[in-house]
Swiss-Prot record:
This is NADP-specific glutamate dehydrogenase. Belongs to the Glu/Leu/Phe/Val dehydrogenases family. PANTHER family: NADP-SPECIFIC GLUTAMATE DEHYDROGENASE 1-RELATED (PTHR43571:SF1). It is an enzyme of class 1 (oxidoreductase). Residues 26-50 are annotated as: Disordered. Induction: By ammonium. GO terms for cellular component: chloroplast; cytosol. InterPro entries: Aminoacid_DH-like_N_sf, Glu/Leu/Phe/Val/Trp_DH, Glu/Leu/Phe/Val/Trp_DH_C, Glu/Leu/Phe/Val/Trp_DH_dimer, Glu/Leu/Phe/Val_DH_AS, Glu_Leu_Phe_Val_DH, NAD(P)-bd_dom_sf, NAD_bind_Glu_DH. It catalyses: L-glutamate + NADP(+) + H2O = 2-oxoglutarate + NH4(+) + NADPH + H(+). The keyword Chloroplast applies. It comes from Chlorella sorokiniana (Freshwater green alga). Homo- and heterohexamer of alpha and beta subunits. Both subunits are encoded by the same gene.
């Protein structure tokens, strides 16, 4: 097993959602051809008024051209004319939101057989696709030098059809409205699959906690919660952690909420166990991914023992995914971050993984390149572990969205990968998923495979309301049962409609929410 001698290919920055690259590139005017087209449009449109700066006519014309190009790929393969029209309308509203449109298309394609059998659910899908509420706000804070810094905060309260909004907070420079909407949209169906009464939401900020002092992070979190507290409560919206939001940030956020509202309630999950948190919450997402694929393997008469696994990421999800894989007898070959990856030719030992966990616990911003081992090989240049030239049985993308593109998928297929289990949210592009399906790889989508995190968040909500704490064994037992229920829920529609596991998960999650919306009336 060795890293390749040449860098892997990847989509250019800004085109990480290949389903809509032409539309987005067109909208942003990134190519010479489209510049020429824009000039032609300008010649047929009113020119900008130098006094008023009126770009309206030009912007409208360019947007129409972008829409025409984008919708060609968006509706490809969709036969239902009403569904095609709906996707076109959604795209026309916000053509620049490529991550969101990627998520909507993926769900829409898988729901086609449902709309054929139950056409009355298509208007409900139209309602579900539009978020109930989108909140954006300014977050001002002082750095350690006394300088004023300003970031943007978001909370997308997408659907409360089956329970209060539930979803994490992400602090990362890449955060924007498109990413928040895609994550909140996915959260609806993920939460539905857990069988717990939770709606879908997501939030965060473009603030980057990396490189910030504890005092700076505290001041930012306090400013962020000063606005967010107006929109959340334990019966309305219950945020949790996500990328960039761990136990430290949750503590600062909870403290500020309590300080302002004078209420000690379970308004956040992922709290420390000293003040209302649950056992296994940090481990839950990574553990859940392993438990999910274990159910898939059991159905095939197999087990995880001896399976060679590639894991991306080095945060909580990746660490605890690797931890449970080792407990189950699997071989973990890699961990990674945005700068590169490290791999152990014979697999990580428990002691080596513990060294990574200790390093990250001491400094959450530590790079995976800082991991030291006599046997480890580090590959930088922002390369990804999917390029490793070795036999692979299971891939666990646990880093971020769209980390596996079409080329990466081809490499996994070449190296014998049989399963892709998503620990991150939407880590595979639509083109990569198409490659999986064509090659016969069993694809375990994030909305099912990584639902362990929100499942234990739901269990934390229950413990808070009941004013009790379950033991580690009790929580793990409940998590194992929930992941089994999620797998069974996805397999039911998969068999009924003769579709793959990913489509089955979408159908199961959607129909539960749609039936709830229908019962509550069109509002």
């Amino acid at each position: 097993c060795r890293p390749p001698s040449s860098p892997s290919l990847s989509w250019p920055p800004g085109l990480r959602s290949p389903a809509l690259p032409r539309a987005v590139a067109c909208a942003r005017g990134r190519s010479a051809k489209r510049d020429v087209a824009a000039k032609r449009l300008r010649s047929r449109s009113p020119r900008m008024d130098a006094t008023t700066g009126d770009f309206t006519a030009l912007q409208k014309a360019v947007k129409q051209m972008a829409t025409k190009a984008g919708t060609e790929g968006l509706v490809h393969g969709i036969k239902n004319p009403e569904l095609r029209q709906l996707l076109t309308e959604i795209f026309m509203k916000d053509p620049e939101q490529q991550e969101f449109m990627q998520a909507v298309r993926e769900v829409a394609v898988s729901l086609q057989p449902v709309f054929e059998k139950r056409p009355e659910l298509l208007p409900i899908f139209k309602q579900i696709v539009e978020p109930e509420r989108v909140i954006t706000f300014r977050v001002s804070w002082l750095d350690d030098a006394g300088n004023l810094q300003v970031n943007r905060g978001f909370r997308v309260q997408y659907s409360s059809a089956i329970g209060p909004y539930k979803g994490g907070l992400r602090f990362h420079p890449s955060v924007n409205l498109s990413i928040m909407k895609f994550l909140a949209f996915e959260q609806i169906f993920k939460n539905s699959l857990t069988t717990l009464p939770m709606g879908g939401g997501k939030g965060g900020s473009d603030f980057d906690p990396k490189g910030k002092s504890d005092a700076e992070v505290m001041r930012f979190c306090q400013s962020f919660m000063t606005e967010l507290q107006r929109h959340i409560s334990y019966v309305q919206d219950v945020p949790a952690g996500d990328i960039g939001v761990g136990a430290r940030e949750i503590g600062y956020l909870f403290g500020q909420y309590k300080r302002i509202t004078k209420n000690y309630t379970g308004v956040l999950t992922g709290k420390g166990q000293e003040y209302g948190g649950s056992e296994i919450r940090p481990e839950a997402t990574g553990y859940g991914a392993v438990l999910f694929v274990e159910n898939v393997l059991k159905d095939k008469g197999e087990s995880l023992k001896g399976k060679r696994c590639l894991v991306s990421g080095a945060g909580n999800v990746a660490q605890y995914c690797a931890e449970l894989l080792l407990e189950k007898g699997a071989i973990v070959l890699s961990l990674s971050d945005s700068q590169g990856y490290v791999y152990e030719p014979n697999g990580f030992t428990r002691e080596q993984l513990q060294a990574v966990q200790d390093m990250k616990k001491k400094n959450n911003s530590a790079r995976i390149s800082e991991y030291k081992s006599d046997t480890a090989v580090y590959v930088g240049d922002r390369r990804k572990p999917w390029e490793l030239d070795c036999q692979v049985d299971i891939a666990f993308p646990c880093a971020t969205q769209n980390e596996i593109d079409e080329h990466d998928a081809e490499l996994l297929i070449k190296h014998g990968c049989q399963y892709v289990v998503e620990g991150a949210n939407m880590p595979s592009t639509n083109e990569a998923i198409h490659k999986y399906n064509k090659a016969g790889i069993i694809y375990c989508p994030g909305k099912a495979a990584n639902a362990g995190g929100v499942a234990v968040s739901g269990l934390e909500m229950t413990q808070n309301r009941m004013s009790l704490n379950w033991t580690r064994e009790e929580v793990r037992d409940k998590l194992e049962r929930i992941m089994k229920d999620i797998y069974d829920s996805a397999m039911g529609p998969s068999r009924e409609y003769n579709v793959d596991l990913a489509a089955g998960a979408n159908i199961a999650g959607f129909t539960k929410v749609a039936d709830a919306v229908k019962a509550q009336g069109a509002v």
